[in-house]
């Protein structure tokens, strides 16, 4: 029986997708491409076995296990998770949150209360049904941030803001399973991710011409930090500690 994998087709996951599709493990897995929020819900309800999961949703998954030392993280500006606003930070009174990712929404709430010292009204926003208003304030994630972020007069990189606040890198998503998997399969899965990381230049081809090829490669190599290092684990633990009680970490770490 194939292992069911929920993956995300944002540019920042391109190396992972390339690795899983072009490694021998492709014969052992069934990949479905969904949004971050759907990836999390599929692991929560048991319709997927592995997923690249926004970190705010990981504690909601029963028997969650982080199974890889690869992640979607940032040691500096991430460029693809942004607060984009028509007004300066201290004037923001309403902030629209992307329903595709629980992590960016929770990060916005934590930074608003503890670092930015603002108290906006938060409202969900469905980008597939509504158009952006450049006079308003939004959290943009993934390819939407890369495409539309530069249109706004005030842009704040969420990873940079977290680093200013905590002096720790930020982790946006990890590879998680909701069940115990054979160690040999996990090793092969990680080898596939490693193969993708070794082929970043090839991995971006599916996103051209939507993104300029050189820009896409530079973004993946400069803005995204894929190694789930000790500092990133510390940053992730700190993020979970600031979350509501129901999101306190109950997660088993890989290794």
Tell where the protein language model's regions lie, with residue ranges.
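Secondary-structure end/capping motifs
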Residues: 181-242, 246
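Hydrophobic residues within well-ordered alpha-helices
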Residues: 42-44, 132, 243
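Short, Lys/Arg-enriched, disordered terminal segments
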Residues: 1-3, 251-255
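Bilobed "Venus flytrap"/periplasmic-binding protein-like clamshell domains
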Residues: 1-22, 80-135, 234
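Conserved beta-strand segments of alpha/beta enzyme cores
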Residues: 4, 30, 65, 119-121, ...
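A local structural motif
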Residues: 24-32, 115-125, 248-253
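Short, glycine-/small- and polar/acidic-enriched structural segments
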Residues: 11-91, 99-100, 104
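Pocket-lining segment of extracytoplasmic ligand-binding domains
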Residues: 124-206
């Amino acid at each position: 029986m194939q292992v069911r994998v929920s993956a995300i087709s944002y540019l920042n996951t391109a190396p992972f997708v390339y690795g899983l599709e072009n490694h021998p493990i492709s014969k052992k897995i069934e990949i479905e491409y969904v949004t971050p929020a759907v990836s999390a819900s599929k692991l929560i309800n048991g319709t997927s076995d592995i997923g690249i999961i926004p970190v705010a949703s990981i504690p909601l998954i029963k028997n969650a296990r982080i199974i890889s030392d690869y992640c979607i993280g940032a040691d500096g500006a991430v460029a693809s998770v942004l607060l984009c606003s028509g007004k300066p930070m201290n004037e923001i009174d309403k902030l629209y949150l992307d329903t595709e990712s629980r992590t960016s929404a929770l990060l916005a709430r934590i930074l608003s209360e503890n670092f930015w010292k603002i108290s906006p009204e938060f409202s969900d926003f469905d980008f597939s049904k509504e158009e952006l208003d450049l006079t308003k304030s939004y959290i943009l994630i993934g390819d939407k941030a890369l495409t539309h972020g530069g249109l706004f007069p005030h842009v704040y990189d969420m990873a940079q803001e977290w680093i200013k606040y905590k002096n720790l890198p930020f982790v946006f998503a990890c590879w998680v399973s909701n069940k115990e998997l054979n160690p040999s399969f996990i090793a092969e899965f990680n080898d596939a991710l490693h193969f993708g990381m070794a082929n970043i230049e090839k991995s971006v081809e599916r996103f051209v011409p939507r993104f300029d090829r050189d820009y896409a490669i530079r973004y993946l190599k400069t803005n995204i930090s894929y190694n789930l290092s000790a500092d990133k684990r510390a940053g992730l633990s700190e993020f979970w500690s600031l979350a509501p009680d129901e999101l306190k970490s109950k997660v088993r770490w890989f290794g």
